[in-house]
């Protein structure tokens, strides 16, 4: 795979020695729910913006880049560490739960040109994709991604495509029924969007198994033997020639770190992570119930510990994206 000099420059800005240790704080709908669980009434704009600022101030010195949204995160972009790169999201949060299509939608007041002008070093877009889903729906999704890829090509800025797999007939992605399908769903979507017509530079993906059902990782029911889980990671590596990074999917910091060791041992040559809730989630109840100062203390201690431990794991497990580009 080859990229332009400008795209390479931007990728270098969001990584450290080819490893992407990025902090994800583009959550909007999920963050509102987390905040609402600890107070009466909905979270305010000020509450959301302030927590994003706190996280950016305290944790970006230890991350190669931070992922933020232009809806609530622009203030946070102003206080990140100088050497830390910036990814901005282009998609609206959430999806229409009344239909199985989960069609994508851009933030209507933004374009790649405007996100770049706001300081982005890369653009991230999230797509829900069922590789076995309705053919017409998938054609619409593919065309949508082609448009975004073309925008990023025109602006000469890296395109990070986040793929979240699902099955149109299964409502619970954490179920045993979906766990059996997950390797095929995750790896199949990666294969589709690795085609150069989509203009994707880096894939942000799920691990291809639900670790809660892997032999040795669960005390409950097992749906993958160790050998089956290893094969799923090997198939993932074979599914794309593009650099790819893992998302934390809201699991605990400990499980995410253990997963990265397992993935690397299986042969997955991932180039880093975009890790969100596994790093900062514990700050939310502290911020809501005890205020800014206590939240800052949590971020400086437990938040720092989470990100520092993750960085150490990445040093041992991740492969530089420069090996693929």
From Swiss-Prot:
EC number: 4.1.2.40
GO molecular function, one term: tagatose-6-phosphate kinase activity
SMART domains, per the entry: DeoC
Pathway: Carbohydrate metabolism; D-tagatose 6-phosphate degradation; D-glyceraldehyde 3-phosphate and glycerone phosphate from D-tagatose 6-phosphate: step 2/2
GO terms (BP aspect): 6-sulfoquinovose(1-) catabolic process; D-tagatose 6-phosphate catabolic process; lactose catabolic process via tagatose-6-phosphate
Catalytic activity: D-tagatofuranose 1,6-bisphosphate = D-glyceraldehyde 3-phosphate + dihydroxyacetone phosphate
Family recorded in the similarity comment: Belongs to the aldolase LacD family.
HAMAP family listed in its UniProt record: LacD
Protein name: Tagatose 1,6-diphosphate aldolase 1
Species name: Streptococcus pyogenes serotype M3 (strain ATCC BAA-595 / MGAS315)
């Amino acid at each position: 795979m080859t990229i332009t000099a400008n795209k390479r420059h931007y990728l270098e800005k969001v990584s450290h020695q080819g490893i992407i240790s990025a902090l994800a704080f583009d959550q909007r709908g999920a963050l509102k729910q987390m905040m609402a669980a600890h107070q009466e009434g909905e979270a305010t704009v000020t509450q959301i913006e302030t927590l994003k600022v706190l996280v950016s101030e305290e944790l970006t010195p230890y991350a190669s880049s931070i992922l933020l949204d232009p809806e609530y995160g622009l203030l946070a972009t102003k206080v990140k560490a100088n050497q830390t790169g910036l990814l901005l999201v282009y998609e609206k949060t959430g999806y229409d739960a009344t239909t199985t299509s989960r069609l994508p939608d851009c933030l209507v007041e933004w374009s790649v040109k405007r996100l770049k002008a706001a300081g982005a070093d890369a653009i991230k877009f999230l797509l829900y994709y069922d590789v076995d889903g309705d053919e017409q729906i998938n054609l619409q999704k593919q065309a949508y991604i082609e448009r975004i890829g073309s925008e990023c090509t025109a602006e000469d800025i890296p395109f990070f495509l986040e793929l979240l797999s699902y099955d149109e007939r299964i409502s619970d992605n954490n179920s045993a029924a979906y766990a059996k399908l997950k390797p095929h769903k995750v790896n199949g979507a990666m294969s589709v969007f690795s085609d150069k017509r989509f203009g994707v530079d880096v894939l942000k993906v799920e691990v291809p198994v639900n670790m809660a059902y892997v032999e040795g990782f669960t005390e409950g029911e097992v749906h993958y033997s160790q050998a089956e889980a290893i094969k799923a990671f090997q198939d993932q590596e074979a599914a794309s020639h593009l650099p790819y990074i893992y998302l934390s999917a809201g699991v605990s910091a400990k499980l995410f770190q253990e997963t990265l060791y397992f993935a690397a041992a299986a042969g997955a040559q991932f180039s880093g992570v975009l890790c969100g809730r596994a790093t900062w989630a514990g700050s939310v109840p502290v911020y809501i119930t005890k205020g800014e100062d206590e939240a800052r203390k949590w971020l400086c201690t437990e938040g720092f510990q989470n990100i520092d431990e993750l960085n150490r794991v990445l040093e041992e497990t991740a492969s530089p994206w420069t090996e693929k580009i």
